[in-house]
């Protein structure tokens, strides 16, 4: 034991969050490795964002429509993805989605206006309900919408596109009257193996 070498990492309070994420990812080996959202939860557990995402994901409509387990925080990531795009609706200036969500998690902690948070949750839940009106029950944001042989595995890219775009529709009643035309074109996009949704 006297000759055993230990490697320790000391993270100061002023250490930038990006460095903390980097260190956490480097030492996140062995056993059951944490996924990216679990790391965000761990590094921001004292922040408002963690509680807010939990509040969204415990909503009965969210649980019913998204239909994904909260065991590995994937539901929290989905809620965060929607919020990230709503808070950053300008040009995407990030190298990857992970960095985008890391920063968005921090930005979420900075929102002090409770009405803003209430509105974000309301917008997501209403959008999820609208997605059921358009796509049908139990669509689960999966490619099985267009390819019946596919299992109903949630596709994150589909979730992003559907929720963010549907949330921006101003006249939803008019859109509902045109939903068959939308579905025809949307299914063609999903069936295209070159599209982002094929991944």
What kind of feature is each model-predicted range?
Residues 1-106, 176-177, 183-184, 191, ...:
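Basic- and aromatic-enriched surface patches that contact anionic nucleotides/nucleic acids
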Residues 79, 85-199:
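C-terminal subdomains that position terminal phosphate/3'-OH groups for nucleotidyl transfer/ligation
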């Amino acid at each position: 034991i006297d000759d055993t070498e230990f490697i320790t990492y000391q993270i100061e309070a002023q250490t930038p969050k990006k460095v903390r994420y980097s260190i956490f990812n480097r030492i996140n080996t062995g056993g059951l490795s944490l996924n990216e959202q679990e790391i965000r939860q761990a590094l921001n557990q004292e922040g408002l964002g963690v509680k807010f995402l939990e509040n969204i994901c415990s909503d009965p409509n969210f649980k019913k429509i998204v239909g994904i387990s909260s065991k590995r925080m994937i539901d929290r990531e989905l809620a965060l993805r929607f919020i990230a795009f709503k808070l950053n609706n300008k040009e995407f200036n990030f190298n990857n989605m992970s960095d985008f969500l890391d920063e968005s998690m921090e930005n979420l902690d900075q929102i002090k206006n409770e009405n803003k948070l209430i509105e974000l949750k309301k917008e997501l839940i209403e959008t999820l309900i609208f997605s059921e009106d358009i796509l049908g029950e139990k669509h689960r944001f999966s490619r099985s919408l267009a390819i019946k042989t596919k299992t109903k595995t949630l596709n994150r890219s589909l979730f992003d596109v559907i929720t963010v775009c549907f949330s921006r529709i101003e006249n939803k009643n008019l859109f509902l009257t045109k939903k068959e035309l939308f579905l025809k074109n949307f299914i063609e996009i999903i069936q295209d193996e070159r599209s982002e949704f094929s991944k």
